[in-house]
Structures are given as C-alpha cells and as structure tokens.
C-alpha cells in the first residue's frame, strides 16, 4: 500500500510503492530457436509505430486479450509465454538531504527581521539591507504579505502534524537517519532525453482533420487491430482494458500502459474526444500549469491563464456529487481564484483544503519551513459538485464519510518535475467504490483512471523503469 501510516493529522505515503504496486508485467510470445520464420505483427507509418513484439524484447501495445491460449507457430507448435516485470527507478525517490539546508537558510536570513513574519503582518513592511556600497529598502508587495499571513495561520498545523507522521515513519524504518557514508555514495541521476516532445506532437495534431463528432472516439488495444493512424492516437481516447501492461512506441520512444487504464493525448483545445467518451466522472483531479514568474523565465513548460483554466468543461465531465480536487501553488492569488471564482463558476462547493508536505528520506523538510522563497508544502482544494437536477446518484445507497479539513499528505517527492503523489488511497473513504475517475493535466497513467493531458505519457517512458525479472 502507498499509505505507510495514517494518523488524525493525515497520511505518510510511499509514492514509489504505489507505482510498483501497479505490477508492470509484460506478457510476450517467445518462439523457440528452431522456428522457421520470424513472427511479428507490426504497424509502421511515418511517425507512429505499434508493435506486438519488439526487436528489443519488450512487448508492445495492440494486444489486450486476457486469453492464456498460446498462439501456434508455422509448425503447429506453441509459442512460449514470456513474462517481464518492470519497476520504477528507485533512485528517482532518493531525496537524502534538503534542497536548501537549514544552515544556508539561516545565513540568508541574518539580515531580515524575522519577528515581522511571526508576530503579525502589517500593510507596509520595509527592511533595510546593507549592501557593499549602499543601503536599499525592500518593501514586500501585497502578494508576499498575503503569503506571510497564510503561512502564519497554517505553520503550526504543518509542523505538528508532519512531525507526528515523521516519527511514525522513523519508528517503522520507512524513514531512516541519514549517515554521512550514505550521502557520500550518492550519484547524479541521469534522466531520459526528451527525444519525443509530447506537447509539441499535440500542437501538430491540432492541424489533423477532425473526426465526425458522432464517431465513437475510443481506440481499444485489442488483437484484431490491423492498422492505426496518427489521427487514431491523437484524436481518440485510448484504452488498455486488459489485465496486463502494454507498450506503445511513439516517435521511437516506448511508453508503458498499465492495465485497466485509458488516456487522451491532446492539447487543451482538443478535448472533444473526452466529452464524446460517454462517461461522467465521480472524482476529477486537476493539476493545472499555473502561471508564475519562474515559469515565464524558464520556458520549461507552457502555462494557462486563470481564464483558460476556467474554460475547462468540468460541468460536462462531472457526475452528480463529483469530488473535485485541484492542486494549487502557495500563491494566494491562485487560492482565492479557486475558492471565489473557479469553483463557483463550475457549481462546485469548497469542502476542504489539504496540504502536501515534502520531506527527505530521513524526515527533514525539503525546504526550511519558514523560508521566504519556497515552502516545503503545496495545497489541494477539495470541492463537491452541487446538485442542480434530480438525477439519481451512482451507487446512491453507498455512504461516504464527510471530508475533513486541513489534512496532511506527507511524502518523499519524486525528483521528476511535477510528479505529484497518488491520491487514490487517501480519498477512498470519501468516494464511492468502483466509480469513474479522471485526472486532468496528467503526466502518468493509473489503473482504473482516465488521464488527459498534452504530456499524459511523460512519466510512462520506459527509461524511467527497470526490468527486474523475467521468466516463462
């Protein structure tokens, strides 16, 4: 389970365990060496390739049958069934020390009047900083003042609740004290090259001819599929309904598709296939690319304005009483926008605010709690779609618990940018079982979930995984 410990304050999660619990097993057909002919079923075209058996031995994507019958070769014999298992690279969760050490943080804070942060926020605060040649006066803007006030309100909640969960993690051995010899052995992590820019492909796909809206917008990965076009991948929801992992090869890059998962790879302007999916969802998790100064400077990924986020068709995607969860940065401007504008425009009532607290493997905050620059926590705003019609609820006889406020989700963050921890297990007491679940702006897939985004396959890249065992 991804939940290592659960207390009244919240949960201590093991993100890596959750990924590996998915059980990424690839089932391949392996012919004995005496075979006469090479058996492959491949579809090739200019920019997309889908294989049944790849030359590297990794099973690929258009077989979703759960049948255990072994196919016959040309001699009438059977191919051997070969199983290969993959796990997520554990070094991507090796966060052995804080991103900013407390000593460095303390040195940076020596010239600041820390009492102003803890003893109340005033409308105008100025700090005299003595430079090498002259004094300069730093005045906090309103956004910074609001952030200080918000931090003051939740600081003790974050500190006390996190320490309780961290202590449990240290007792159980999930978290461990950092010894000097462990830190010396750390090596730089080599990440896969972004040779296949998914977002750029989605941008190009916008110029493909659109399908008739009345057409069925779903592509099931089944054995009978004989041809696939670019339009099939980019303009349809793709499903792996089998109990096994599949692989697709896109622009020469391989991506693992977990069992019982589905996805739509598209730009925000091409969400119509998701609306034509003939499904509404009981849980919708949103991780918008919020606009901020650092994103503008880095050009690492595109961002959306509040107006663009507001235009996401949540009312058409949400089932009655749908639980909506939105990840949000610590900017008070974004928090107010969700609570005062975004959710009301979608007829969603705010019911709780939770906090994701990021720690190291030894239980330290990844940033000093009182750092004026970056905090070791992020927020989640939870809301319920308000009833507008007399439509019957799915599983209306199933009772779910009311959602408590200010719960903590404490975990070691993945070193990959914006790879959020899973919410399935922490939400299970507050949602109906066997519901329909959707993640928007997703960068990975989950069994039982539909995922959408222009980088929806990003963290499914096979290079993020390691083959750990094989057998027949």
From Swiss-Prot:
What SUPFAM superfamilies does its record include? S-adenosyl-L-methionine-dependent methyltransferases
In Gene Ontology terms, what is a biological process of this protein? snRNA (adenine-N6)-methylation
Reaction it catalyzes: a 2'-O-methyladenosine in U2 snRNA + S-adenosyl-L-methionine = an N(6)-methyl-2'-O-methyladenosine in U2 snRNA + S-adenosyl-L-homocysteine + H(+); a 2'-deoxyadenosine in DNA + S-adenosyl-L-methionine = an N(6)-methyl-2'-deoxyadenosine in DNA + S-adenosyl-L-homocysteine + H(+)
Give the record's keywords alphabetically: Chromatin regulator, Cytoplasm, Methyltransferase, Mitochondrion, Nucleus, S-adenosyl-L-methionine, Transferase
Q: What is its main location?
A: nucleus
**Which Pfam families does this entry report, sorted A to Z?**
MT-A70 (PF05063)
The record ties this protein, via InterPro entries, to: DNA_methylase_N6_adenine_CS, MT-A70-like, SAM-dependent_MTases_sf
UniProt-listed Enzyme Commission number(s): 2.1.1.72, 2.1.1.-
User: What is the main EC category here?
Assistant: transferase
GO MF terms held by the record: nucleic acid binding; RNA methyltransferase activity; site-specific DNA-methyltransferase (adenine-specific) activity; U2 snRNA 2'-O-methyladenosine m6 methyltransferase activity
- Ranges in a coiled coil: none
Q: One Gene Ontology cellular component annotation?
A: RNA N6-methyladenosine methyltransferase complex
Q: Where in the cell is it found?
A: Nucleus; Cytoplasm, Cytosol; Mitochondrion matrix
Q: What protein family is recorded?
A: Belongs to the MT-A70-like family.
Q: Which PANTHER family match?
A: N(6)-ADENINE-SPECIFIC METHYLTRANSFERASE METTL4, N6-ADENOSINE-METHYLTRANSFERASE
Q: What is this protein called?
A: N(6)-adenine-specific methyltransferase METTL4
| Originating species | Homo sapiens
Its ancestry begins with:
Eukaryota, Metazoa, Chordata, Craniata, Vertebrata
